[in-house]
């Protein structure tokens, strides 16, 4: 997943040569099936977006994109753009629609895009982020009722990261009161999120960019090299096999109670808190080494059995 960092308030964006490099190198890894373009707002770099969608399709990958829909000014303009991105090879368009985006992008623009996508048979879905005080989606979707037929809609609680960390009061967040009784397994570590500075993380969650999970940087490694680093990262392996409860159980074992005294929006929020805690991560290093030894022992046993 290539994350364009283009919004009106930042000049940072991923160089096109990096994106071309990533797409070309993706052909060496069969498990990479889809290239996603996000942001920021990728449609602010429209011609580059069209070019990279074509590039992704030319090497046999699916192409998806996320947008706030600012460009659906009229139905004719929406139809023109939908036709162009579909012709370029876009497989799915995701729209961000909620009260936060609604302050800047009118419902009429979203309606134009949904109608145009329906006419061109371009698959589209909608994602919404809510807080306690910004959860009034009924008015928005009442206006989109007809256009929403056969359009999947996903709702997620706002995470306290980025601007939300400084601009949204903690009392407005929607917390999971039962987080510690859940399995907290992670099924999201199958994506590469690539940031404008080239840093790569194994997760597309806004809360996933923590140092222990960082895989590397596209300036330093090929995608194949990053994939090897992904497979050798012990924290990623544990998240996939055991989930966050491995860390919570370990915290309880060593008497590290800090995590149990806070509230969390969801497991992504909990994940961010755990992996951002340098003291805790330092204290559990010996246990990570033990896990490495267990994995290596299993590998040796498998080799012996194969003989």
Please state what every model-predicted region is:
Residues 1-17, 29:
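Canonical Radical SAM [4Fe-4S] cluster-binding loop centered on the CxxxCxxC motif
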């Amino acid at each position: 997943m290539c994350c364009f960092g283009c919004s009106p308030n930042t000049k940072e964006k991923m160089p096109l040569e990096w994106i071309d490099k990533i797409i070309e190198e993706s052909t060496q890894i069969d498990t990479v099936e889809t290239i996603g373009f996000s942001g920021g707002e990728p449609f602010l770099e429209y011609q580059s977006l069209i070019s990279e969608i074509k590039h992704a399709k030319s090497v046999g990958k699916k192409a998806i994109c996320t947008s706030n829909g600012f460009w659906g000014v009229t139905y004719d303009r929406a139809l023109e753009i939908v036709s162009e991105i579909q012709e370029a090879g876009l497989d799915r368009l995701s729209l961000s629609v909620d009260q936060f985006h609604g302050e800047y992008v009118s419902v009429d623009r979203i309606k134009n895009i949904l109608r145009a996508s329906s006419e061109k048979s371009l698959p589209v879905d909608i994602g919404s982020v809510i807080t306690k005080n910004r959860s009034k989606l009924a008015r928005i979707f009442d206006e989109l009722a007809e256009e929403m037929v056969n359009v999947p809609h996903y709702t997620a609680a706002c995470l306290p990261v980025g601007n939300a960390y400084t601009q949204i009061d903690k009392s407005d967040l929607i917390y999971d009161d039962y987080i510690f009784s859940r399995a907290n397994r992670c099924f999201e570590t199958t994506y590469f999120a690539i940031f404008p500075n080239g840093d790569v993380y194994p997760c597309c969650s806004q809360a996933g960019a923590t140092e222990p999970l960082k895989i590397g940087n596209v300036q330093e490694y090929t995608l194949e090299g990053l994939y090897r680093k992904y497979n050798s990262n012990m924290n990623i392996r544990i998240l996939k096999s055991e989930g966050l409860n491995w860390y919570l159980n370990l915290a309880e074992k060593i008497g590290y109670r800090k995590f149990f005294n806070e509230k969390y929006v969801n497991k992504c929020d909990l994940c961010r808190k755990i992996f951002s805690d340098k003291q805790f991560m330092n204290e559990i290093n010996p246990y990570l080494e033990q896990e490495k030894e267990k994995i290596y022992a299993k590998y040796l046993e498998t080799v012996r059995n194969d003989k």
